[in-house]
C-alpha cells in the first residue's frame, strides 16, 4: 500500500502481495531480483526523462531530499530505518512512475516486498547511501536527459556492486515450499 503525502511524495506503507506473480517473485533470489530491477529501472529512467511532468518533478525532488537526509548519518537511527528504506524505494518507484508506463509500474510494484526484504539485509547509512548516484539519476530525469538518466541508473547498480555475476542468495519466504 502506498501513501501520498502532499509536498513530500509517495511512501510505501505495506507490502501486500496477493497475486500469482507476487508469489512467484517471493521465491526469487537476490541476483534474480537485481537483474530484473536493473533491466526495468534503466529503461524506465530513460522513459521518465522523456515523459515526466511537473507533478513527477515535484515528487522526485521532495523524495530525493528526504531520502538523502535519512541516509546521511553514518548509521541510521533504528527509529528511522523504516522510513529510510521506504523513502529509498519510493525514489526508485517515482522514477518508474514518471515513465508513465502502467505495465512497468505494475511489475515494479509487484517487486516492492522483495526490495524491502533485500534492503533490510544490507547496511543502511552514509557509507552505503550512494547519494551522488541517486541525485544524478533524479536530476537527469528532471532535466529530460535520457542518456544521463539511463547511465546514472546503470552507474548506481554498478556502484552497489550488484553485478549479474554476483551469487544469488535466496529470500527466506518460499510460499510453494
List each model region and its residues.
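Residue-level detector of well-ordered alpha-helical segments, enriched
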Residues: 36, 40, 56-59, 83, ...
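Short basic (Lys/Arg) and small-residue
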Residues: 95
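Amphipathic alpha-helical segments enriched in hydrophobic/aromatic residues interleaved with Lys/Arg
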Residues: 56-74
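C-terminal all-alpha effector/ligand-binding and dimerization domain
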Residues: 65-68, 83-87, 109-177
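Short linear motifs at protein or domain termini
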Residues: 1-46, 50, 169-177
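Short helix-coil transition/hinge motifs at the ends and kinks of transmembrane helices
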Residues: 19-24, 73-80
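Short loop-to-helix capping motifs
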Residues: 99-102, 144-145
Amino acid at each position: 500500500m502506498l501513501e501520498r503525502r502532499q509536498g513530500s511524495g509517495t511512501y510505501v506503507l505495506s507490502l501486500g502481495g496477493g497475486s500469482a506473480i507476487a508469489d512467484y517473485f517471493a521465491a526469487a533470489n537476490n541476483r534474480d531480483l537485481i537483474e530484473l530491477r536493473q533491466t526495468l529501472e534503466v529503461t524506465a529512467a530513460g522513459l521518465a526523462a522523456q515523459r515526466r511532468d511537473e507533478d513527477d518533478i515535484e515528487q522526485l525532488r521532495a523524495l530525493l531530499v528526504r531520502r538523502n537526509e535519512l541516509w546521511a548519518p553514518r548509521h541510521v537511527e533504528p527509529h528511522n530505518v523504516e522510513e529510510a528504506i521506504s523513502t529509498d524505494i519510493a525514489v526508485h518507484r517515482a522514477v518508474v512512475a514518471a515513465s508513465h508506463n502502467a505495465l512497468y509500474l505494475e511489475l515494479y510494484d509487484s517487486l516492492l516486498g522483495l526490495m524491502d526484504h533485500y534492503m533490510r539485509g544490507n547496511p543502511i547509512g552514509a557509507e552505503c547511501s550512494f547519494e551522488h548516484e541517486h541525485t544524478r539519476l533524479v536530476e537527469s530525469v528532471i532535466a529530460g536527459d535520457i542518456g544521463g538518466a539511463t547511465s546514472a541508473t546503470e552507474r548506481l547498480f554498478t556502484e552497489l556492486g550488484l553485478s549479474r555475476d554476483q551469487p544469488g542468495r535466496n529470500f527466506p519466504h518460499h510460499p510453494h515450499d
